[in-house]
Amino acid sequence: MDSVALMPLLLLLLLQPPPATPAPPVRDPFALQLGDTQNCQLRCRDRYPKPQLAQEELGEDPIQSRRAKAYDRAVLTSACERGCRLFSICRFVARSSKPNATQAECEAACVEAYVKETEQQACSEGCWSQNPEPEPEPELEQKRKVLEAPSGALSLLDLFSTLCNDLVNSAQGFVSSTWTYYLQTDNGKVVVFQTQPVVESLGHEGARLQRVEVTWRGSHPEALEVHVDPVGPLDKVRKAKIRVKTSSKAKVESDELQDNDFLSCMSRRSGLPRWILACCLFLSVLVMLWLSCSTLVTAPGQHLKFQPLTLEQHKGYMVEPEWSLYPPPSHAYADSPPPYKLKLDLTKL
């Protein structure tokens, strides 16, 4: 009887599902392209811990106070985490810009995104938390090694490689491309990430911000769009027209009217002064004209070669010609009268 009573219990134990494994943490779909922001988000959560009610607040309305503080903490934490993501987006779009410029763009985006000063400060703290330690750039490190090397060890190969790197970096300013990423999240939804950057080189003098146009169209209604227009020197970044909106369409505005001529565009993209570009263009035109004229003058098919004749050769041609002359007519029959024809029928003998 005891064994019969234990059978249903054994069946229930066998049919019971295994204990559920803990769900894996949600993976950021943009971590591969934009960089990991988990550490920055953890710093934001540690910076704004859960609120603890004081003794004097317990007698008023502890539930209402706790809800208000929890809401404020959630808002500040969200602003800080958004600052982390904004910094990674600005750094992804403007790879060639300096960290200070990326930090300035992120802070300007925070100023435009939030109205309250506390939220702006939290977003800026997220930008600072995501900002990595400044590392020496490979080009600058290579130049420093070349300059610090002794004169005997300085070779032409190092100078040539440095010159090639400078030319390649200058040529990158002419490249303007668009990236589109289609990522699938863990819940099966497809997220489209589009970037339309306008590459602008940041020089030492008159450095200008790059225009960043990022559209984040996800499954959630809060889509992120960042628009940064070229607004002049970096010290005026606070006055930048930067839009962080949740709409599907954003307007791009510009405060300054930049020079649109060819030399200004080339100077802005290459980083060279206008007078150097003008001199190079003028010399190129002169070289092309000189090559065209020299080609026309020295072309081998445009000349006929004549062999000069000496005086003896000229006389030889006149005295002894190579061809036979036509014999002159004979004068034997010149004085004789023409023959006379007689009519024999009319003649009478």
UniProtKB/Swiss-Prot annotation:
Gene: TMEM59L
Chief localization: Golgi
Chain ranges for the short sequence motif Microbody targeting signal as given in the UniProt record: 347-349
Family listed: Belongs to the TMEM59 family.
Locations listed in the record: Golgi apparatus membrane
Keywords: Glycoprotein, Golgi apparatus, Membrane, Signal, Transmembrane, Transmembrane helix
Protein name: Transmembrane protein 59-like
Glycosylation sites: N100
This protein's record includes keyword Repressor: no
TM region(s), chain numbering: 276-296
Membrane-topology descriptor: Single-pass type I membrane protein
Any matching Pfam family: BSMAP
Gene Ontology biological process terms in this record: branching involved in ureteric bud morphogenesis
GO CC, alphabetical: Golgi membrane
Entry function: Modulates the O-glycosylation and complex N-glycosylation steps occurring during the Golgi maturation of APP. Inhibits APP transport to the cell surface and further shedding.
UniProt KW Transmembrane helix keyword: yes
Source organism of the structure: Bos taurus
Annotated signal peptide: 1-22
